Amino acid sequence: MSFWKNLFTSAFTPISAEADELIKEDRKQFEENTPSKKNFETQSPDEPSPKTTDSTGARDANLSLKTQEPIVSADDAKGAQGKGADEKEEKKETIQPPEEVKTEPPQPEEKEGKEAKEPEEPPKEEAEEPQEGGEEEEEEEEEEEITDPLEKMTQECMDAPDCKEVKHHFEECTARVTKKVEQGDKSEDCIEEFFHLYHCARDCADPKVFKVLV
């Protein structure tokens, strides 16, 4: 047991001594680099300030940058964004493409020539109108020439010997009624005598007209 104890102590004693020396050196270096509160109070203004580590320098630089940056509130940021959007819209409104000027192509001279020729057409229409009027006059003359054969033969039969007696009674009635009308008496008329004469003339004219048509 004592053998193993002596062996363990002889092996690890130098290592522990070296470790203690390293720890002491690191602590001494740390104390030299980090200034204490006592040093700041007792330090004279002529003495140089103790050295600071890189971490403390970086921290001081960040603090100085934060103090220099302006503090912008949320409302100010929104207002700045709104102003930027308004300025962009105004630029879009002001920058507009130039309006295209529509120019009508000049009309060809052929159309003018056609327009100049158009007034010459009405005389042709005027010349055609007299022809149409002449045709209508010819048709009217033909219609006037064509007479109803029944009326013609009925008139002839009234003067025929077969209807001579009936016609005589009609003429006497007509003369008598005319005198009464002149005196203001309208009590008599000759309608019955007229129909007797007309029927007599038709009885005479109808067979003759039938023969002509057949």
Swiss-Prot record:
Family to which the UniProt record says this protein belongs: Belongs to the UQCRH/QCR6 family.
Extent of Acidic residues compositional bias: 126-148
Compositional bias of kind Basic and acidic residues: 25-40, 84-125
Organism from which the protein derives: Schizosaccharomyces pombe (strain 972 / ATCC 24843)
UniProt keyword annotation of Transcription present: no
Gene: qcr6
Listed SUPFAM superfamilies: Non-heme 11 kDa protein of cytochrome bc1 complex (Ubiquinol-cytochrome c reductase)
Name this protein carries in UniProt: Cytochrome b-c1 complex subunit 6
Subunit structure: Component of the ubiquinol-cytochrome c oxidoreductase (cytochrome b-c1 complex, complex III, CIII), a multisubunit enzyme composed of 3 respiratory subunits cytochrome b, cytochrome c1 and Rieske protein, 2 core protein subunits, and additional low-molecular weight protein subunits. The complex exists as an obligatory dimer and forms supercomplexes (SCs) in the inner mitochondrial membrane with cytochrome c oxidase (complex IV, CIV).
Subcellular location: Mitochondrion inner membrane
UniProt function note: Component of the ubiquinol-cytochrome c oxidoreductase, a multisubunit transmembrane complex that is part of the mitochondrial electron transport chain which drives oxidative phosphorylation.
Keyword terms: Disulfide bond, Electron transport, Membrane, Mitochondrion, Mitochondrion inner membrane, Respiratory chain, Transport
